[in-house]
Amino acid sequence: MKRNWISTEEWHPSAGFKLEVEAMNTVISDKNTLVVAGPGAGKTELLAQRACFLLETNTCRYPKKILAISFKKDAADNLKERVELRCGKELASRFESKTYDAFAKEIVDRFKNSLDESYRPSNNYNIAENRDVRRAFEIAGLSFRGNQTDFNRAYGNKLSINKLPLHTDFIDKIFIDAWNVLLKGNKDNNFESSLTFEMISRLAEYLIRTNRYIKKAIEMTYSNVFLDEFQDTTSIQYDLVKACFLKAKTIITAVGDGKQRIMLWAGARKSIFEDFQNDFLSQKRTLIMNHRSAPRLVEIQKTMYNRLNEDAVELQTNEKWNHEDGEAYLRLFEDHIKEADVLSEEIARLVEKGIKINKICILVKQNVDVYSKEIINKLSQLNIKARNEAVYQDLLKEDIIKILVSLFRLASSDRRPDDWDYIYDILGELYGIDEGYKPKILNDFIIKVELMINDLNANLNIVDEKQFSALVDSKIESISYEKFASKFQQYKSKDYFDDLVDKFKRSVWIEYNETKDWIKAIDNFEGKNSIPIMTIHKSKGLEYDTIFFVGLEDSAFWNFKNQPHEDRCAFFVALSRAKRRIDFTFSSNRPAGFSNLQKHDCINEFYELFEDTEIVKKIEY
């Protein structure tokens, strides 16, 4: 690859970005580094700029690559897009961004023939769901009468605790037998080979640990590795990272924030920062910028540091803010009806002032429908849409959904360049078309895509849901399911693929039936015209102009006495989603928990915090 590389001395951040000192030190570092980066610190930009430095200076020497591992697919996609934006697609082709699950699955799928026969899964194994795991245990001889939650606690969650190979010295035989059923399937019980992602990670770790040639191949492929949201890393995931890169020349940059460690319930490793520093002899750098939140909101966030056992840091805010910017309210209501009245009116006022409707978010600790039903009804009376985002959040991240959305946009005359670029890129990958092909092949491909979109446009004048369903199916058939399954591992399950398409059909048709406008229907489906409502866990990594946290009550934080640190982290995550304003509500009467009568005795420290700041304005109704 011939290219004029930039010298490390002459390199400067892409797009004119000014990085704080420790961020710049991280970007150009040649050592393993743990970066402690709080909310709004610009973690995605930091990693994108580091990728640019490594690629543009050839510090990541061609043809080696950079591997970025994230928890969520959308986070992995966002980072990949940011790197492409900062240094161009040619250089970014050596930047791989994927989830832990995808990384582990690629290793197993590529090298599974190197596994001992006893641990080698079937070629076309499925991804196991909770009910599949339970059935495997039952086939293995377990008799368990509890519900699925009880089963997960007693058996399902413990299935992959141990590294392979499994021995009865360390684990009950029923677990080994269930592993075998899941690995190999069971014809007598019509059970196909099905693996959980935790099992896949254990198989990947075992492959690398027992085969030095595979470990060497991975080391030779990647000169640098980025680990995002590192505070949520599980022991299984960390074991895989160590198997791949411990004592290797690969340089690892791990970015996380202990104040946002809210995934302990999902197996996050409490000691992950300390373990990484000890195992990889990493340096530690702390970022002090908060580019997201207004100064007064950052002051509230800082008061949480002591309660989260974090060292006090002199946080700095973005220069776009004035010193007095930021609003915070604590609203105390007699009942949830009055709460809904006031919040709906407040939201209506914000919209009238020009705040985009999807830049306002309603957060709850749990049970979205319980805490937001009345608010949704009141907002509807004011012609403001609000919806439970959990129904859409994962769906909208799916590749097949993104493809269908872009096709319908282009067919509906909303011909945005981004959609054209995306469709040409993704269909080019599906059809195996490369930019280096001869002009005639490229031209034929462009004509094929345009004909597909023109045909879709010509058939948009449909009258019922059945016709819409047939139209969507015809577009998928014209590309072919096999191409989707070949490109996207998750779509090898035809049932999973069909379920996603069915959800798209139902959701978009509901919106079109209401608006009779395809652009509005797609916009509504994407949530551009509605207020998102979600749990704190679903809000992680997101930001909004204004946050309304509904139900700062004991019944919402019902397990606070048993997990105070994790609930404090959850509170901190909610607090730090807001850019300009945050409102907390308490209702003395609410149909939630064991009693309608609500209190805040257990979580009163949050209320004391509000008083201590002298920033949060308390309003009683």
Q: What is the meaning of each model-derived region?
A:
Residues 229:
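Walker B catalytic acidic pair
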Residues 408-597, 605:
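Conserved helicase C-terminal RecA-like lobe
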Residues 1-115, 216, 576:
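P-loop NTPase Walker
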Residues 282-283, 289-382:
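Helicase P-loop NTPase motor core
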Residues 116-192, 439-488:
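Coupling/switch/interface segments within P-loop NTPase motor domains and analogous charged loops
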